[in-house]
Amino acid sequence: MSAAMRERFDRFLHEKNCMTDLLAKLEAKTGVNRSFIALGVIGLVALYLVFGYGASLLCNLIGFGYPAYISIKAIESPNKEDDTQWLTYWVVYGVFSIAEFFSDIFLSWFPFYYMLKCGFLLWCMAPSPSNGAELLYKRIIRPFFLKHESQVDSVVKDLKDKAKETADAITKEAKKATVNLLGEEKKST
């Protein structure tokens, strides 16, 4: 690990949060430097993602759990920059999930797939301005969206109109059925 990365990693491990508090307690009880403990945990998780049962679930929990928590905090904060950062992550996560749905049957057979997927998701949620989600959104998703926006808007409008027509027709039929049922009930009494 380069000196700059090691220093940044150590700074990250000394920030105040529940995980670093737990690391501090472990460090105090064992006498082992918290960076070694963290690297050990990372190594165990990586091994589990390669060989463990339920690696898919663990990977999805990592890709969903922390971002969901931070997204809720971002919604509750007055700052809107963090909202944009996490909305970008969720757009990329959604696109990735759809692509993965069609390719997962093949990819899940590769031994390092879930470890690589987890690394990809961690890269997408990295706390830096040029993280994976930002990069993929700006270079791939946004240009594609802008190119096809009017067509997608048209399809969405058509679907919305058809859904409204269907809901109105079902409501109308339900009202008729209710009136008929009540009318038959009055006749029988």
Curated annotation (Swiss-Prot):
Pfam families (UniProt xref): TB2_DP1_HVA22 (PF03134)
InterPro entries: TB2_DP1_HVA22
Entry keyword set: Endoplasmic reticulum, Membrane, Sarcoplasmic reticulum, Transmembrane, Transmembrane helix
Tagged with keyword Endoplasmic reticulum: yes
GO cellular component, one term: sarcoplasmic reticulum membrane
Membrane-topology annotation of the record: Multi-pass membrane protein
Segments passing through the bilayer: 35-51, 54-74, 85-103, 106-123
Ranges where the record places region Required for dimerization and maintaining endoplasmic reticulum morphology: 114-185
Topological domains, Lumenal: 52-53, 104-105
Keyword check for Plastid: no
Cytoplasmic topological domain residue ranges: 1-34, 75-84, 124-189
GO biological process, any: endoplasmic reticulum membrane organization
Subunit relationships: Monomer (heart, ventricle). Homodimer (atria, kidney, intestine); maybe disulfide-linked. Homotrimer (heart, ventricle, skeletal muscle, liver). Interacts with ATL1. Interacts with ATL2. Interacts with ATL3. Interacts with CKAP4. Interacts with RTN4. Interacts with ZFYVE27.
Function field: Plays an essential role in heart function and development by regulating the organization and function of the sarcoplasmic reticulum in cardiomyocytes.
Stated family: Belongs to the DP1 family.
Name recorded for this polypeptide: Receptor expression-enhancing protein 5
Organism: Pongo abelii
Gene field: REEP5
